[in-house]
């Protein structure tokens, strides 16, 4: 039985996930291809500001987890096996020294993915009375 291995090299995805959407799903797929498992870190921003231009955070930790789990399940990924989700403080800065043993990588996507906007998704949910 394969389980999430806390000692194994792992890709970190840090974000607000307000809400998790197709762009995040595609990023996850690239991440899991690198090491076989991913830790999704959810910044604790419900009802708070995540920084400049990041004040709109209506989804709770519980809702964010449900959104992530249900979407990843559609593509066959299981929490506790392929990934784990962790609540973390409202991280706004990441600093490091030299030779730390990890890298920062930006993934570039085509316009159909890069144009997805959580801001627009939240606005649409509000228009439909779902948020």
What residue ranges belong to the model's regions?
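Nucleotidyltransferase catalytic core that binds NTPs
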Residues: 1-131
């Amino acid at each position: 039985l394969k389980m999430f291995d806390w000692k194994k090299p792992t890709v970190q995805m840090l974000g607000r996930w307000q809400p998790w959407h197709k762009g995040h799903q595609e990023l996850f797929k690239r991440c899991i291809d690198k090491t076989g498992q991913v830790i999704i870190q959810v910044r604790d921003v419900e009802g708070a500001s995540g920084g400049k231009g990041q004040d709109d955070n209506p989804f709770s930790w519980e809702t964010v987890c449900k959104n992530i789990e249900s979407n990843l399940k559609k593509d066959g990924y299981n929490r506790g096996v392929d990934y784990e989700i962790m609540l973390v403080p409202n991280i706004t800065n990441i600093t490091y020294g030299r030779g730390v043993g990890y890298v920062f990588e930006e993934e570039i996507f085509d316009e159909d993915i890069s144009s997805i906007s959580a801001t627009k998704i939240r606005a649409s949910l509000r228009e439909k009375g779902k948020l």
